[in-house]
Amino acid sequence: MATLNEFMKFTKEVLDDFASRVEDNSRKRFLRKYKFQKKASTKGSLYNAINKKVQVFENSILVSFPFMKDVDYAKFVDQGVKGKTSSYSPSKTSPFKFGSGTGKKGGLTNAISQWVKSKRFQFRTEDGRFMSYQSMTYLISRKIYNKGIPAKKFFTRSFDEAYKNLPDEIIEAFALDVKQRFKEFTTK
């Protein structure tokens, strides 16, 4: 008896193409500059982690995108985070919110402090002196906490766009699989 991998050859190819389209479009959208950004995103650990996985089991085919679980902040970049006082318009529908009491205290401040020190830049005060890293961390953290993080929807939009065509493609591929299998049975 043929395995699912042999029997569903065309269907697996369609699902693999679907996953590849989502992966490629997610990478393109991630680097795109949005109106709320001063400049486009850079290729960092999240960009490099964007991947797909298509697995064939005994009676099913699984398409997954493990980077959404592997990179702990991927969902926040994709869906955004609502701020405590106001939010960016793309983040209004986000399930995540600063000040909800679910995150660890001081996590944002520590991360911003490390980021500011690694980038090695400093703001200037009104009289021209450089601000301390601690003051910059406070200002940036307060802004993010109050305004939130805008949603990029780099994965969500890519998935939804590719998913629109998927049902028709799967029907055609499944029909080809059945047709091929039927030919094998009738020619024996």
Stretches found by the model and what they are:
Residues 1-74, 90-92, 96-188:
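Short, Lys/Arg-rich flexible segments
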Residues 76-84, 107:
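Charged low-complexity regulatory regions
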